[in-house]
Amino acid sequence: MFTPLSSVTALLALSSAFLGAQAGCKPKNYGPEKPHGGNGGNRGSGNGNSTSKFIAKGYYTGWNSDDFKPEQVSWSKYTQLAYAFGIPTDSANFNLSLDASNAESLDPFVTAAHEHGVQVTLSVGGWTGSLHLSYAVANAQNRTTFVKTLVDFVVKHKLDGLDVDWQSPNKLGLPCNAINANDTANLLLFLQELRKDPVGAKMILSATGNIVPWTDANGNPSADVSAFGKVLDHVTPLLYDVWGSWSDSVGPNSPLNDTCAAPDKQQGSVVSAVAKWNKAGIPLEKIVLGVGAYGHAFSVNKTKAYVNGTKELAAYPPFNKDIHPKGDKWDDPAGVDPCGVATPDGGIFTFWGLIEHGYLNEDGSPKRPYRFDNCSRTAYAYNEEEQVMVSFDDAQAFKEKGAFIKSQGLGGFSVWNAGSDHKDILLDAIRSGAGLSK
């Protein structure tokens, strides 16, 4: 039986002590009755109580599979990979589409993973693929239909489970997403029904969240999500995109801590998110920390990029919101989102993109003006010629997040995404910090 920490303060105190120290430093195929267990010791428990094995997880983006093929995955360093994304295509039958994710790549990927003893889940939804999720769980009939759709898909493709990537129940993500005040309650009913299915009872079942627990019927972060912990094998708070082009200034993509920042710069962090999810009833060992192997680019004038009279990069400098820097070749180009709204270039640099574009050296060390922020424990790099600043996690940031995972007894990590690293610099760093071998 899980008993949450008595207060957020308890976890924050432990975390502060940790941060102070850091500052100084071939499975078989299966039929409907029995899901495949690529790494049997970490198979879903059927009641959400599988906590015995550290989870080293990564997302595999199907739309990038031509650039990042299964044979390029460092299989021995992962226990799970989530194939992104399966998208419900309508508000009636909730059929899944992988049209945007190279559907033909899924089965070969699953085969390759299982040959290496690694489990594969399908990530359902995503930021641009959650338009119909509210409908899919809105009533008993829809939930039953959606459960059947998902179970049939899992069986057909020999998957080990599902990752529900609905980041904003009862909270507007894309402007055309369906929302309902009862989204979070309905999501729980759906997950409970999925667990009652003979296949669903045995699969890995996880869900993503943000820096606060899912939104309740009153529009506030839920105070009690302990029932989710009974049906899910793990919850992954996505601790990235905390700052970006929507923010008032440049800021850390994934702050480890922000209690040392000015109050108006405290937008949430790894430390605060873990404390809030735990206080709301998710056991620490069921929290798998979502980390990002990429950074956000901002247009920052040279007169604002440095501390006055120095070559030290400034903290939280203003940026030009009218200029949207292009990222690397995996960046989302300017276009139209699923709602028909025009969108600019995404300004995203993968870790290898930072090397390819000259922000970092081949070994991940700084090549351009650089700052490691002692508060957020994240990195910044600046291209003076193009006047672009990028906030991101470097190897030190990943190592410290790994150490935090270990110190707090979390369930593991989940990196977005497996193909964004360079020569496993980040993957090795977080594994090292968590006490795992390279």
Swiss-Prot record:
Residues annotated to bind chitin: W416
Alphabetic keyword roster: Chitin-binding, Secreted, Signal, Virulence
Induction of its expression: Expressed during the biotrophic interaction with cacao.
Stored Pfam families: Glyco_hydro_18
GO cellular component, one term: extracellular region
Effect of L238M: Recovers chitinase activity
Record's subcellular location: Secreted
Secretion signal, residue range per the UniProt entry: 1-23
Molecular-function GO terms, alphabetical: chitin binding; PAMP receptor decoy activity
GH18 domain ranges (all copies): 54-437
GO biological process, one term: chitin catabolic process
InterPro entries xrefs: Chitinase_II/V-like_cat, Chitinase_insertion_sf, Glyco_hydro18_cat, Glycoside_hydrolase_SF, Glycosyl_Hydrlase_18
General remark: In plants, chitin acts as a microbe-associated molecular pattern (MAMP) that is recognized by lysin motif (LysM)-containing plant cell surface-localized pattern recognition receptors (PRRs) that activate a plethora of downstream immune responses.
Summary of the function given for this chain in its UniProt record: Catalytically impaired chitinase that binds efficiently to chitin, but not to chitosan, xylan, or cellulose. Despite the lack of chitinolytic activity, retains substrate binding specificity and acts as an effector to prevent chitin-triggered immunity by sequestering immunogenic chitin fragments. Does not function in the protection of fungal cell wall against plant hydrolytic enzymes.
Family that this chain belongs to: Belongs to the glycosyl hydrolase 18 family.
UniProt-recorded name of the protein: chitinase-like effector
